[in-house]
Amino acid sequence: MGGFDYLQKGGTGFTLQVKKPQIRRVVQTRPAAPSPSANKATPRTVPSGPQKKTPETASRSVTGERGFSPSKRRLTPLRNRKRPTPEQRLSSDDDDDGSDTDTSLELRKRARTGESAEPDYGRRLRSLKAFSGDETRSLPIVHASEITSVQKPGKFKPAFENMNQTSEIFLQYPSATPKERYEAVVPRDDDEFKPLDDIVQVIETVTQAYIPEDELDEFNNESTGIKRRLRRALARGSEREFRESVKDYNVAIERLRRSGSIAKKLDATYRLSLPHVERILTQIYSRTVSPRVDSLRQYENGTDNVYGELLPRFISTIFKETGLKSNHVFVDLGSGVGNVVLQAALEIGCESWGCEMMQNACDLAELQQAEFKARCRLWGIAPGKTHLVRGDFLKEQSIIDVLKRADVVLINNQAFTPQLNNELINHFLDMKEGCQIVSLKSFVPVGHKIQSRNLNSPINLLTVKQRQYWSNSVSWTDVGGSYFIATKDSSRLKAFSESLA
């Protein structure tokens, strides 16, 4: 199952016949809380799902089940290391079986659910072209109906009894672009894409992020609001009521867009909420990576690479901790299928780079990048520029060059060999002052001091802060741990050198 597939499996799935929330519990065997040294091996299978709780307005499924946050992070491959059987974590924080040690329970309790990045008043969120009125041609997006009728035929069934001959439903997004095409079907297997649920979540997100306050009653009214009518239609299994609700939503969005209300709301917005970011990234992933996720499994099964993923809320926290802004440059070394690169470009609006050497992952990253550009236009968002590079990040000249002007560099080095870490350190010499390097293992040994005998070591240029990540931040464990933010700062080395003189 792919990284964003969990959102479809647990977080946003629904059954039309069920009229009350379902409680799902998946029991798994948990290892004892790892010691600091045990954190060195963090095996991971192909991209798997996020598990963060998000605000109800954006991520509550139509059956009341908890949503999982999308987006993920892949650990850059480690050579010659065996990979234990991976686990799929479907339980939420509430499903704690109490088998962890006191330490892990404490870390689990302290899970954070903060906002996304700080407001960036220098960023223009709205895509001017998306609201120009010239978007008469269809965007090159992968329509939801292509998943259900082309990519995975036979895996879906009619969503309603006695359906009309056509199963198509068209959904308007906040921009001037044409509608997205859906089919009124549900998956035979609960793991698969759920188009009706995607419709509901899009409407939730649009209501939260694009609708002016004085217009919200049409969407949020507990009796007659569009969102309430959608859920009532699903609970009753009424195709007619569902289609009417979507039609009324489309009309309302068109009216608000033409009046300029949506553009005005976006122009007064200076950050995207994390649920908003997650919804867009989940759509991209489900239309590009999920149908081809077996290619990642095949590649992994033939190698000794170890995978691990940093989940989207953790990534958002990193953006806040480093003060990443839209005028900055972000680089992800070992970018996998490109999720973090896309998240930085979308959530922050910055220039975002990634480098990956695994060919199957690179192929999927390029599919995601193409869908990302089109789908951001669909949502009316202007993202930062994205650059995905194939190859070894130690050798690719474009990466070597961009590292010299990078503001934030992410290196998921949890399972890197000492040799690879040492080779990376040499690249820090060329980074600019103030560049921040985020890693799961510190490049500076504990207790390191600048001395005459190590005066030429590149790590003398780094000032390191240790931070805690909380439960459901990484893919390989529910337990929290540490990460490090190293800032290039030559002042200490300069002061020491002057003291010798």
UniProtKB/Swiss-Prot annotation:
Main location class: nucleus
Control of this protein's activity: Ubiquitination of histone H2B to form H2BK123ub1 is required for efficient DOT1 methyltransferase activity on histone H3.
PROSITE patterns: DOT1
Residues binding S-adenosyl-L-methionine, per UniProt: 307-310, 330-339, 356, 392-393
GO biological process per UniProt: DNA damage checkpoint signaling; DNA repair; methylation; subtelomeric heterochromatin formation
UniProt xrefs under InterPro entries: Dot1 (IPR021162), DOT1_dom (IPR025789), H3-K79_meTrfase (IPR030445), SAM-dependent_MTases_sf (IPR029063)
Enzyme Commission numbers on file: 2.1.1.360
Gene Ontology MF annotations: histone binding; histone H3K79 methyltransferase activity; histone H3K79 trimethyltransferase activity
Region (Disordered): 1-121
Basic and acidic residues compositional bias, start-end: 105-121
Pfam families, per database record: DOT1 (PF08123)
Family: Belongs to the class I-like SAM-binding methyltransferase superfamily. DOT1 family.
Protein name: Histone-lysine N-methyltransferase, H3 lysine-79 specific
Organism: Emericella nidulans (strain FGSC A4 / ATCC 38163 / CBS 112.46 / NRRL 194 / M139) (Aspergillus nidulans)
